Amino acid sequence: DDNNIDAVIFAKTDLTLNGSGSLTIQAQAGHGVVSKDDLVVAGGNYTITAASTGLTGKDSLSISDGSFAITSGKDGLHAENADDAALGCLYIAGGSYTIRAQGDAVSASGALRVDGGTFDLTTGEGSASVTMDTGEGFDPGHRGVPGQAPAAPEEPAQTEEAETDSVSEKGLKADDSITVNGGSFTA
């Protein structure tokens, strides 16, 4: 239900956060800031810790300057409109962003445009999310004879069930175009 969004700040219509002040949000369950239409942020200092997304605009998310420290259980900056492919756009013009997201740092279902800014992005569990499975019983020294098929294993290989849900963990993600005009990125 679109009317029951758990967020510290929630608007059914457009929402604008404007000014040079500071805002600290702790959302132990749910989102930090959500607008069901356009979310516009113009300046300010934001510290957001959210179990779900940090900043979300359904129709669009537009940010002009500001300082953002976001730790989120899902996406850090998020714009998504499943009903209209022309919406869900995300625009960033300058600012400083430190984003630690379990999902994508910056995600748009439409176009994503970045015109400058400083970005320090960590997604998933950082380097700890990388795992390597060498396979039990694999002999890296055995290369076989060229031209011959490898011998069949004596025992059937064990299989693991894969999860059907996968979490996207990208720094910048868009289902449409991504345009970057300047800026500094660390991932």
Indicate where each model-derived feature is located.
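A composition-driven surface/loop motif
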Residues: 1-187
